[in-house]
């Protein structure tokens, strides 16, 4: 299967990568998406910002409130991600995740590592133990940001443009 064909809208997706002096930037600024929509109007149906995948350490709290340290491959996404990339939700709600501050969505494989059943992941807490460099003004140096798992989605294949050949485990 070719890149991105796992998504329902693959034939209408456009991947924009930004570079500054030859260095790839890790995400797309909101202003660019707004500008593209304004300038190209009817040609842009929707947009979503996705930061490149990177590993992030978390403490995950289990059913009995045990704290377990894990490092997950994470991407930062906005609330429109599901409109373009059509992930299949197997537990919880994308809508709740999109409108809840500090919500995360985890993949089915990640849920299986942590809990006996996908549904048991919903409402559980994950605390990031390091800084998010794409949001330096809002992230404490030591991390400490608490997230709540609001949805579990089917695994995202490794052959997608947003994380080519890397296994995504958590969407922040």
Regions found by a protein language model. Name each.
Residues 78-91, 102-172:
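Mid-to-C-terminal secondary-structure elements
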Residues 3-6, 35-38, 91-95, 116-117, ...:
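Short, flexible, glycine/charge-rich loop motifs used to bind or transfer phosphoryl groups or to couple energy/partner
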Residues 9, 31, 76-80, 84:
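Generic alpha-helical secondary structure signal
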Residues 24-33, 60-65, 145, 152, ...:
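Short charge-dense sequence patches
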Residues 1, 10, 43-44, 94-98, ...:
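Aromatic-residue hotspot detector
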Residues 18-25, 48-80, 90-104, 129-147:
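Short acidic/polar micro-motifs at solvent-exposed secondary-structure junctions
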Residues 13-15, 47, 74, 167-170:
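Conserved beta-strand scaffold positions in the cores of enzyme catalytic domains, especially
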Residues 2-57, 68:
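Membrane-proximal extracellular/periplasmic loop immediately following the first transmembrane helix
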């Amino acid at each position: 299967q070719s890149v991105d064909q796992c998504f329902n809208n693959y034939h209408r997706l456009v991947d924009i990568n930004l570079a500054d002096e030859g260095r790839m930037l890790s995400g797309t600024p909101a202003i660019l998406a707004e500008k593209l929509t304004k300038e190209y109007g009817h040609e842009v149906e929707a947009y979503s910002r996705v930061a490149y995948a990177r590993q992030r350490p978390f403490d995950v709290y289990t059913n009995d409130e045990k704290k377990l340290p894990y490092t997950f491959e994470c991407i930062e996404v906005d609330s429109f991600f599901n409109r373009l990339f059509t992930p299949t939700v197997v537990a919880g709600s994308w809508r709740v995740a999109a409108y809840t501050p500090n919500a995360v969505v985890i993949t089915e494989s990640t849920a299986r590592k942590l809990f006996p059943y996908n549904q048991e992941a919903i409402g559980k807490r994950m605390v990031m133990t390091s800084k998010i460099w794409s949001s330096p003004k809002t992230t404490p140096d030591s991390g400490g940001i608490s997230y709540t798992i609001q949805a579990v989605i089917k695994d995202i294949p490794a052959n997608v443009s947003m994380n080519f050949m890397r296994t995504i485990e958590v969407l922040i």
